[in-house]
């Protein structure tokens, strides 16, 4: 009887784990915006400061294409 209960417990934990992973995969409602896309370059300090103050988000400088100047990309909760 103890083996059956242990097996049921393991299956239950597996099901709960799968559902929690599926909920995380759906997304947490995060949005992305390019801050000042016409700027000639991305100053990481100014980029992060603008993102935090305007959107309460996280920012990084990312180039959209190889050879193009990086843009300030801000990710925040929608």
Swiss-Prot record:
Localization in the cell: Secreted
Annotated signal sequence range: 1-20
One GO cellular component term: extracellular region
GO biological process: defense response to fungus; killing of cells of another organism
UniProt keyword annotation of Signal present: yes
Keyword Disulfide bond: yes
InterPro entries, per database record: DEFL
Record-annotated disulphide pairs: 31-78, 42-61, 47-72, 51-74
Keywords: Antimicrobial, Disulfide bond, Fungicide, Plant defense, Secreted, Signal
Main localization, broad class: secreted
Entry-linked Pfam families: SLR1-BP
PANTHER family named in the record: DEFENSIN-LIKE PROTEIN 155-RELATED, DEFENSIN-LIKE PROTEIN 184-RELATED
Protein family (similarity comment): Belongs to the DEFL family.
UniProt name for this protein: Putative defensin-like protein 154
Organism: Arabidopsis thaliana (Mouse-ear cress)
